[in-house]
Every structure is written in structure tokens, then in C-alpha cells.
A protein has these predicted regions:
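Sequence context of c-type cytochrome heme-c attachment sites
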Residues: 33, 626-635, 664-668, 675, ...
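Short, flexible, mixed-charge glycine/proline-rich loop motifs
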Residues: 628-644, 684-691
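Short, structured motif recognition centered on aromatic/hydrophobic residues
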Residues: 642-659, 692-696, 704
Length: 730
């Protein structure tokens, strides 16, 4: 809503910053008290403050998708508390159930506590982190082998286990008996209590300064301001319907690899956004998602495209947004007994990619250059990882879960720069990669290398971010074992505006290696020296055993590119070759740039190579010059509904038709194209196959759009710009 009354602008901003500072200090308390590297270094946690509605007053933004779990979990507790007569300061609920309380997955445990002022209940505080273990057949909250939710570990619908600021002793015993690392898990819960205590203390100080009535007034003002600015941005997006499709890979059980389709239709109507998700029926595997992950990941996409960085995160941002996930019983709206222990990282992260996909389609057609400048290639939003359990070198046990390869994923290319290397996931805006020394000090592992993977970023005028290759051996133990999981091996993240998709992720063990032989010679087992027997494994493993000196290699995927690779500055390509970001063959075959042995651009050979690639694209000599486009990819004349090439203005479709129908199409299995391009993807041999559909302007041969789809899918729709169907019917 728009603010119509006068208010003290400076006081409102001071108050807004105070709310943000409280959530930041909650985060500092978590980091200082947890001791878990997942918290202290990876920063896999979030904190927030809410009013009694509940609505966000501040959010620490370390992991963005917790905007969903914090809101839904607190809503459930607030409903229970509304009929309770014994709500007291120091009470606290523990929550980790995706089905009943909006948790992202069981490994993400929340502690939610009421806040008070002079005896009056005035709101809620929330702290969440990924704890080391929650029991069940999986380790650290991941259970690829589970067939139902009860196999996955402990479930806490909102349970009030905290009284007077301490965990009930009987509940302590219960939790300790059901997890593999009771000490660290219980300490993490205590650290979340401490974080909430910080919220209560700091909030009291702020209200003492402002007064309770002014506190509430400024909370409303700042929510109204966030809503107002977001609505102003949405109004600059063309009304219409924007659609996208993606696939979740493989269920983790025996049988053929599955591709599970999910879709999103976004309706832009004035200053409102309506999300309509749909998906295939739920399955008996840990990939299913529920309301918390779906809402959180939809908002994560929106926050990174339209909000995060320059708009305060509070309840006002959710007012223009409606998220629908369709009828119960699908992979986007699963119900018990569906397993959900990777809801956030499987279907959930696909939901985030879909959110960004439709928003980038919409922003690309805006008349506002600032909004057009916010489009970007897809981030990887999937990572190859594992979780292990076994004895360590200190005479105890270790639960190993390294989010390194999640934070090591490449970021999508942007209009102003290449994608960030080792960017992380869309949601991990505050994430970090733990030091190797900390891993080796706590766990029985020896790291062999961490390096960036050449050619891993999606090609484009702006290149996608490069990804991390990491390898470690179980060196100080006879054996460790646990699940393995990789959400993005066959369907990599696509680019935007003619940019190309990026590397997908992959992992594999290497057995019978020469680690000890090298160490005995006084040599480090580096990437160049290490040898062993690579074992090809599937993307989801209920159990993988790593014996002594078995190496686990995990290669993250990169970020999608932006714009035609043939428009990339040849000097930038030469620098990438010099820095070993790009191989010479990749520079030549994809970018059309010939780089000499001393890393200089051979201009004549480059011009000839680029002309050769253009002619190959359309099967003949282009009739128009390829030049930097006014608009990335395709342009739309709104009055006539005419689609045209953003570079040479060649007409592609009229009257609201599909621009893809007027483009020159080249389609091939993605594994074949990646082999030609020197890039990485897992070949899918089952039907349907994953293909790359490249669309080129028939006149200038510019790359207009590159789709990554299954070979049985119809041509993707172009946006339908105009009044959304729902609005027209009302």
C-alpha cells in the first residue's frame, strides 16, 4: 500500500536498521556458539524477527529460502499459541517437519520463540540451521534410499520442548538417543536458543528507546515502503503470462533414471505477481517438495531478481505475491508418506530456477533499462555431495557433510559482467566454503585438490561462472559410508538471451589409488600426480562406502551464459585461455576466437572462424551483419505483437506468435553437443533424451535462445504479453 500520512523519515530508517541489526546479531550469536562448521563457515543458517501476525520485520539473508520456512513454521506455531493460556517468556518450539510446518527438509531444524515486552506478547523470533544429523537411514538429513518420510529421521511438527530458555531434559535424552552426533546436535539447538535470547534482549532495548506504539507504527511503515517500491517495479513489467518447464532428475532407487517434470506459469497483472506451480504425481523418493520449500524457493528467485540488495526484506514484500502449488499429491505439493529429505535441493531448487526463468523472460520485455539489466543466466542450483559417518582419527566418530560443492557452483552471467566463480546456490547469499584445514582437523580426511574447472561456465557474450572441482580421501580411517546425491547431472542450467548452458555436476569415487605411494616419496597427491580406478556411479546413492584412501571427487556445475558467444570480446576470451578458465579448443569451437601460444588474439583467423560458425549455424552465408544487440536475444514490439531479432531486427513472428517458429533451429542430444564443446554433462541414454535446441536468426545468425529440454517436449512457448487470463475473467 502507499503511505498517505506524514512520518519521520529518519526515525523510520533508524528503526528499520535496528530490526535488521537484531537479526544480524542473532546470526552472530549462532556463529559464536554453534561450533559446527556448517554454521561457522558454510553459513547454512538464517535468523529473523516477526510480529504477531506473523510478518517479517527483519531477515538475516544468509540462506534466502528460509523466508518460506520461517513464515510457514511461525504461522503454525502462532495458531497453536493463539489458543494456549500458558505462553511464557523462554518458551520455544522445535520444528523440522516439511509436511506439517513448512521446514525446508528435516536436516534444517528451527527454534522459534515468542518475544515479549513488559509481559505482553509482541511477536516471534526464529533461528534455523542445518544440524549435523537427525537420525534415520540417511546421514545429516539426506536419505536417497528412503521410501517414506518415517525412514528419513526424526520429525518435529512444532513441539514446545523449551521452557524457561532451556531444553526439557527428557527431550534432550530422546534427541541424543536418535542422532549419530548427539553432542554437536544438542549444542546447535542450544545455540539457536541463545540466538533467540539475543533477539529478545535487543528488541527490548529498541522498544525502550522508541516506545511500543512507535515501534509498531514504524514496523508498519517500513513494510508499507517495501511493498510500495516492489509494486512500482512490478508495474514496469509487461502484463502477461510467462511459462517455464524444468525436470528433477532420478528418484534414487533401482530402475531407470527418471525425469520428473514440473512447470511454472507466472501471471503479471498490474502490481501483482501470481505463481502457479504444477508437477507430476509425488513419488516414493526424497525429492518431493512441500509448501515451505516451494514458497521459499519461489521467493528466492524473486528476491535475487527484483529485491535482494536494495530492498529491505520484510513482510511488505510478500503482499503483491501469490504462490499456488496446485492439488495435494504432486512433487510440488507432496503429502505423507512421501519422503522429503531433499525437498529444498531437488524439486525446491528447480522451483527457484523456474521462478528466475519466468521473471527474466518478463524483465527482458520491460521498457525500463534498469529492469532489463537485471536478467541473468541460470545459476547451477544443484550440487554433487555426500554425507558420511564413521570413526575419526581422534578416537570418536565423525558425521561428514561438506556443503563445499554447493558453495562451489558457478553463478549465472549478468548483463554487466561474467558470472561469479564458485558463486554457490541462488539461496546461499551469505554462504562460504570452509577451510580445508578445518575439515582435516576434525575428520579423517585428506584433501587432494580444490580447483576451478575449465570450460564449466556457460558460453556467452558474458560467460557463466566457473565451478569447483574438489577431491578428498578417507585417509585416517579404515572406512566411512553414507548417501550420495546430485540434483543436476543430466539437465544443466541454461543461459539467457542466446547464452549457452553450463557444465552439469558429477561425482565419483576413485579406488585403489596411489596416495600412500606418493606420500612415501614425499610428494603430494595432486591432480596431476594422482592415479586410480574411477568408478561410475549413479546420481543418487542410498549408500556409498569409501574405504581407506578411496577418493571422493565432486565436480560442481557452472552458471549459464548471457548473449551470443560470438559477441564476446576476443580479448576476454584470450584472458580466459591464459588463466586456464577456457581451453584453446573451446575458445575456437564455441567463441570463434583463435588464441596464439603466447595468449594473443589472431584477429584474421578469429574473423574467419566466426564467419565459419555463423554460416554453419544457418546453413549458408548470413545476409545481415552480426552486431551487439539493442536487446539481448529477441525484441518485442508490444503494440503489434511482433517478435524480431535483437541485433538485425529480422522479423520472426507477428500477431503474438512464437518467435522460435521464425528462427533457424538446430537440435542435438546435449551430451553430443557438450562433447563437441569440451563441456561436462551426464549422458542420458533412457527415453526421453535431453537435447539442446539452438535458435538462430535466419539473417544475421545471432544466437537468439538455447533451450535445454527433453526430446519429446513441444516447442517452448513465447510469453503471452497482455492482460492475464485470470484478470480478464474477473
Amino acid at each position: 500500500m502507499s503511505i498517505t500520512h506524514d512520518y519521520d523519515v529518519i526515525a523510520a530508517e533508524v528503526h528499520r536498521k535496528a530490526m535488521q541489526n537484531i537479526t544480524d546479531e542473532m546470526a552472530i550469536t549462532l556463529v559464536r556458539t554453534s561450533g559446527s562448521p556448517i554454521v561457522t563457515e558454510s553459513k547454512d543458517f538464517s535468523t529473523c524477527l516477526m510480529n504477531t501476525v506473523p510478518e517479517h520485520l527483519g531477515f538475516s539473508s544468509y540462506v534466502l529460502f528460509h523466508v518460506g520456512s520461517s513464515l510457514i513454521g511461525t504461522q503454525v506455531i502462532a495458531k497453536e499459541a493463539s489458543v494456549a493460556t500458558d505462553l511464557q517468556p523462554g518458551d520455544g518450539w522445535i520444528v523440522n517437519d516439511p509436511h506439517s510446518a513448512g521446514a525446508m527438509h528435516q536436516g534444517d531444524v528451527s527454534v522459534i520463540m515468542p518475544t515479549f515486552y513488559e509481559g505482553e506478547h509482541i511477536g516471534w523470533s526464529f533461528a534455523n540451521m542445518h544440524v549435523l544429523d537427525v537420525g534415520g537411514v540417511g546421514i545429516s538429513g539426506y536419505a536417497p534410499g528412503a521410501h517414506d518420510v518415517w525412514q528419513e529421521g526424526m520429525l518435529f511438527p512444532p513441539v514446545r520442548i523449551i521452557r524457561e530458555g532451556a531444553i526439557d531434559s527428557e527431550w534432550e535424552k530422546y534427541i541424543a538417543a536418535n542422532v549419530r552426533a548427539p553432542g554437536p546436535v544438542l549444542n546447535d539447538i542450544r545455540s539457536m536458543i541463545a540466538s533467540n535470547n539475543t533477539a529478545q534482549k535487543k528488541l527490548t532495548n529498541v522498544i525502550n528507546e522508541f516506545g511500543l506504539d512507535s515501534h509498531r507504527e514504524y514496523c508498519e511503515i517500513n513494510m508499507d515502503l517495501s511493498e510500495q517500491v516492489l509494486r512500482e517495479r512490478i508495474e514496469k513489467i509487461p502484463d502477461g503470462t510467462y511459462e517455464a518447464v524444468d525436470w528433477n532428475e532420478f528418484d534414487g532407487h533401482e530402475g531407470p533414471d527418471q525425469l520428473l517434470e514440473l512447470r511454472l506459469k507466472l501471471e503479471v497483472d498490474g502490481s501483482d505477481l501470481r505463481y502457479h506451480y504444477s508437477g507430476v504425481p509425488q513419488i516414493d523418493a526424497f525429492v518431493n517438495s512441500t509448501m515451505g520449500p516451494m514458497f521459499g524457493q519461489a521467493m528466492t528467485g524473486l528476491m535475487t531478481v527484483l529485491i535482494n540488495g536494495d530492498l529491505p526484506v520484510n513482510g511488505g514484500l510478500w503482499r503483491p505475491i501469490d504462490v499456488e502449488i496446485g492439488p495435494p499429491g504432486t512433487i510440488v505439493n507432496a503429502v505423507p508418506p512421501a519422503p522429503v529429505s531433499n525437498a529444498h535441493s531437488e524439486v525446491g531448487m528447480r522451483a527457484c530456477k523456474l521462478s528466475k526463468d519466468v521473471l527474466c523472460q518478463a524483465l527482458a520485455l520491460s521498457d525500463d533499462p534498469v529492469l532489463r539489466g537485471r536478467i541473468a543466466g541460470q545459476h547451477q542450483d544443484g550440487f554433487p555431495g555426500n554425507a558420511l559417518f564413521g570413526n575419526n582419527q581422534h578416537g570418536g566418530v565423525s558425521v561428514v557433510f561438506y556443503p563445499d560443492n554447493a558453495i562451489g557452483a558457478g553463478g549465472g552471467a549478468q548483463t554487466i559482467m561474467d558470472g561469479l566463480d564458485a558463486y554457490g546456490l541462488t539461496c546461499t547469499t551469505g554462504g562460504g566454503i570452509p577451510d580445508i584445514e578445518n575439515h582435516e582437523g576434525a575428520d579423517p580426511v585428506l584433501f587432494l585438490w580444490r580447483r576451478l574447472i575449465p570450460n564449466s561456465g556457460g558460453p556467452g557474450q558474458m560467460r557463466g561462472g566457473q565451478a569447483l572441482d574438489q577431491a578428498y580421501a578417507v585417509h585416517y580411517s579404515d572406512m566411512m559410508a553414507g548417501p550420495g546425491f546430485n540434483a543436476c547431472a543430466q539437465v544443466p542450467p541454461h543461459g539467457v538471451g542466446g547464452g549457452y548452458p553450463a557444465n552439469a555436476g558429477i561425482f565419483y569415487p576413485v579406488r585403489n589409488g596411489n596416495i600412500q605411494e606418493l606420500l612415501d616419496k614425499g610428494l603430494l597427491p595432486t591432480y596431476e600426480r594422482f592415479e586410480g580406478e574411477k568408478e561410475d556411479v549413479r546420481s543418487k546413492l542410498g549408500h556409498i562406502k569409501l574405504d581407506h584412501d578411496t577418493v571422493f571427487v565432486a565436480l560442481s556445475g557452472g552458471g549459464g551464459g548471457l548473449g551470443d558467444p560470438l559477441l564476446r570480446d576476443p580479448e576476454a576470451v584470450a584472458r580466459d585461455v591464459a588463466f586456464e578458465y577456457t581451453t584453446p579448443d573451446h575458445a575456437s569451437s564455441v567463441y570463434g576466437v583463435i588464441v596464439t601460444d603466447d595468449h594473443e588474439v589472431d584477429e584474421a583467423a578469429t574473423t574467419a572462424k566466426r564467419e565459419e560458425i555463423r554460416a554453419t549455424r544457418i546453413g549458408g552465408t548470413p545476409s545481415a551483419e552480426l552486431k551487439a544487440p539493442v536487446n539481448i536475444g529477441v525484441s518485442l514490439t508490444h503494440d503489434s505483437g511482433t517478435w524480431s531479432c535483437g541485433s538485425c531486427s529480422e522479423e520472426l513472428a507477428t500477431g503474438g506468435g512464437n518467435w522460435r517458429d521464425g528462427a533457424k533451429l538446430s537440435e542435438a542430444p546435449i551430451a553430443e553437443r557438450y562433447a563437441e564443446m569440451g563441456m561436462q554433462v551426464r549422458d542420458r541414454v533412457e527415453a526421453p533424451r535431453v537435447v539442446m535446441r539452438e535458435h538462430f536468426c535466419p539473417s544475421c545468425a545471432m544466437s537468439l535462445g538455447v533451450d535445454v529440454v527433453t526430446d519429446d517436449l513441444e516447442t517452448l512457448k513465447a510469453p503471452e504479453v497482455g492482460t492475464p487470463v485470470a484478470a480478464a475473467a474477473s
